[in-house]
Amino acid sequence: MKKQRLVLAGNGMAGIRCIEEVLKLNRHMFEIVIFGSEPHPNYNRILLSSVLQGEASLDDITLNSKDWYDKHGITLYTGETVIQIDTDQQQVITDRKRTLSYDKLIVATGSSPHILPIPGADKKGVYGFRTIEDCQALMNMAQHFQKAAVIGAGLLGLEAAVGLQHLGMDVSVIHHSAGIMQKQLDQTAARLLQTELEQKGLTFLLEKDTVSISGATKADRIHFKDGSSLKADLIVMAAGVKPNIELAVSAGIKVNRGIIVNDFMQTSEPNIYAVGECAEHNGTVYGLVAPLYEQGKALASHICGVPCEEYQGSAPSAALKIAGIDVWSAGKIQEDERTTSIKIYDEQAGVYKKALFVDDKLAGVILFGDTRDKQRLLDSLLKQRDISIAKKQIIEPETSGPLFESMPSSETICQCNTVTKGAIEDAVHTNSLTTVEEVKHCTKATGSCGGCKPLVEDLLRYMTNSEYTKPASTPSFCSCTDFTEDDIIAELQRRPFTNPAEVMNQLDWKTKNGCSTCVPAIQYYLEMLYPGFVQPEPATEETCILIPQMYGGRTNAEQLRTIANIIEAYSIPDVSITHGQRLKLSGIKPADLPNMKKDLKMPVYTNEHRHALQSIKACTCGQNRSIQQLAAQIERQLEMLPLPAPISISLSCETDCTEAALQDVGAIRTQAGWDIHIGGVRGTHARSGALFCVTENEDSTAGMIKGLIQYYRETAHYLEGVHQWIDRLGIVHIREVLFEEDLRAQLLESLQTDLSLIQNPTVETGAYKKG
């Protein structure tokens, strides 16, 4: 089949991240052609200030070498700009008069420095700070001149100013506002930062409006609205950026400040997408790395036809990249009538912390002088955790040892590149890594904005500590593959697989048909990802079982009479009572099963439902009918729900006559409400489950049990029992999730969506499709 052609206009970080995501999802789908205006492969523009400050070299900031493009069969045209899009013919035209057709086009033209529209702005010696060429020019100018001025005291302006100072120049920073970094810091943090930078030798001219630049052959003086002026041999414009939308405008694509896109980064023109600093989503143009990478994932999934979450916007976070200064902020920073706040200011230690809350949910954070807990606070911000959790994190930050000791392997260290603690640990052990640079090349952590570099350094130090325990290596899932179970799950989420055979083929299984370990596991995970679409499996058993459903363990004469007639009519050889208080009919001929189901006229479970939730054992002592009613209610709501492994649930009175404490999930009715226990084990190695929580009434009990089951479904491995799952995740973590109302509500909503599909199934022959 002929490949579609995917053309990328722009060879920067956002565009190339899209291509990387596309290659992960389906490396054979597109012929990829990339045009880049600059004469370089993709590099990290964010770290140009680090080059200026002497913290990195130009080679260090290269993200994708020419070999990477060649390895993936990508055609790269450097130093060539797309100047026109013919939407009727689906063609792009470049400044070298090259015409190329496309099936899909991604516009990733980025942004340009905002050069103030004032007299003299075009003189020699006035620069933006955006490209490698800009960086090289500034480094060259610093060798010949002494006085520099930076217009703009945002992130880029301050980083450039410190870089020029590192090169030996006297630097003045000019800013139109009363405080520096006003988009990221409040007045207190801005004042503290300014004081620290002044101690390093920078001079600040605040509330200054630049009106002109003068000089004979080159710029040598800046003039202000108040009549004053400043001598400057070198002037850097860092007063913001403007999205490059000219290409879209000329093609008739809808624009505002940026190119307007939807939640999948599609423009108003079919088959044309936009991403990065040129794109505008819901009225916002993002200039930070993490949001652009999040956009790239949504775009790549949509362009490859893979079901994915829509891009919903991002909570911006920013860290100042200046050695020896710890400043970080995220989300909302200015107070208003809707906000409450927690502030900590230790003047002697030079530490300032502020957390803003809206409706008792964390909405924004500023950290100055101590940013150790920024990753946890960012996680709390993204999940909108309530005030009690965030308050503890901001008041009592953990030192690196306990922080990493308690941090799960799944927690993200590098937000830009979605690199987890576990991925870094695995890379360090597998490849004997010892430096941050080696970790970056192996995992991409620290390779984008650089904000996680201190955290990665701390993790490396912690891993050399005597208290560090090396995590056990994860074996491959089975002998058919080298993938671990988590690897397989990640691939299933990433790619549009249609059946187990396709999974095994595309993931290079060593055996053609898999084995009894991997095939049912893949089947289960696909059903979890696409609920309600079940691939029929050939019957392998010589006989079948059938369990009539009796909600809450209760029945009546009519049901029993019907069951008895069925037993006689079909000569059922074996009838028994299950642990879950149900009748089990065994030894049924497969050919008889369809007619038996019709004759029973009641819900049934058969072999194919072996891991579905079948029954909830309820107290039969007669003290309280509400217990049986609650069991029946939950059974009806969760009927046919697929589970990773068989699960036992029991509801009991205060005497625990159903041994609820020994079940996977058990709820015991008390005078105060309900005690919910989880993780019990029956049999020769019996153990009571741990008390998970206490609920007030039947509704809250049902909600907690259903939320718990859904979280188990979403995070447990195939055939992983509840007690094993608890041991792996930790009961504290599970409590944190289920006790938070918003997260529990999300779980219950997901459960209801899954149930609506499961209980109204569509049978596909060999295919899984999302409804």
From Swiss-Prot:
Provide the residue positions that the database annotates as binding [2Fe-2S] cluster. C414, C416, C449, C452
Q: Which residues form a coiled coil?
A: none
**What are the UniProt keywords, alphabetically?**
2Fe-2S, Electron transport, FAD, Flavoprotein, Iron, Iron-sulfur, Metal-binding, NADP, Nitrate assimilation, Transport
| Cofactor(s) named in the record | FAD; [2Fe-2S] cluster
Which Gene3D superfamilies is this protein grouped with? 3.30.390.30, BFD-like [2Fe-2S]-binding domain (1.10.10.1100), FAD/NAD(P)-binding domain (3.50.50.60), Sulfite Reductase Hemoprotein, domain 1 (3.30.413.10)
What molecular function does GO assign, one term? nitrite reductase activity
Q: Note the superkingdom of the native organism.
A: Bacteria
Task: Give me the comment on cofactor binding.
Answer: Binds 1 [2Fe-2S] cluster per subunit.
Induction remarks: Positively regulated by TnrA under nitrogen-limited conditions.
Biological process according to GO: nitrate assimilation
Q: Which InterPro entries match?
A: BFD-like_2Fe2S-bd_dom (IPR007419), BFD-like_2Fe2S-bd_dom_sf (IPR041854), FAD-bd_OxRdtase (IPR050260), FAD/NAD-bd_sf (IPR036188), FAD/NAD-binding_dom (IPR023753), FAD/NAD-linked_Rdtase_dimer_sf (IPR016156), NiRdtase/SiRdtase_haem-b_fer (IPR005117), Nit/Sulf_reduc_fer-like_dom_sf (IPR036136)
Which positions does UniProt annotate for FAD binding?
43-79
Q: What does this protein do?
A: Required for nitrate assimilation.
Q: Mind telling me which NCBIfam families this protein's record contains?
A: nitri_red_nirB
* The protein, known as: Assimilatory nitrate reductase electron transfer subunit
Gene name of this polypeptide: nasB
